[in-house]
Amino acid sequence: MQLLARANLIFGLHVHVGIPDRETAIHVMNQARYFLPHIYALSVNSPFWVGHDTGLKGYRLKVFERFPRTGIPDSFESLSEYTDYCNLLVKTGCIDNAKKIWWDIRLHPFFDTLEVRVCDAQSRVDDTLAIAALIQALISKLHKLLRQNVTFRIYRRRLLDENRWRASRYGIDGKLIDFGREKETETRNLIHEFIEFVADEVAELGSRREMNHIERILHEGTGADRQLAVWERTQDIKAVVDHIVAETYQGLSEVELAAKATVAS
């Protein structure tokens, strides 16, 4: 990858959710694609690049898009179609294995998981847990509905990309397209609908405490919003970095902090 790889100084949050049957996992992946911009909007945490305000809440994916085989994947009719796609790439020397497929969501080639890769890394532990809980509840919900032969319309990647761009640009402060209603809707409202959609799974999974934190994100803003607030106040990128460091320590126990101090010394 040459300079592309050397310049790829970005950090993402990848969440794995187990689905033992890979045929089922492909169909769950098809359904989950629609929700990726909603999840990304909650997770945006990369408004700066090389010390400059990019004007985007999430710039990380724009950096990563320089790589091949990124973004929201196309839908696949079956595991066989997906396997044929991967085998063709290996046969023609594009990749040596399917781990070189870096989509926003993918069927992991070695683990029996769906891996959601769209999110920016979070600076607060509670934000990380909340987003992971939302993803877990979504995959569980879609898996359960699929077993009941309930599915949703599969939208084209190019339509989903419109929402992905909006999430990158505005985070939770913008609007996403509600394709079912064919109109723009406040992102926060769609996320509230999302939370209601998975509410029964949250209760079953016992992740209510983690999920409740999403309301805090919606109220206080994303990691990107907090970084930009520091920037607006100080016009000092070092102050932004100090803020990120301070947030990273929030939620860590005294034992964990002591262990970090020991390693550092």
Listing of model-derived features with the role each one plays in the protein:
Residues 1-13, 17-20, 26-73, 77:
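Metal-dependent DNA replication initiation modules
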Residues 3, 64-265:
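C-terminal accessory/tail domains of diverse enzymes
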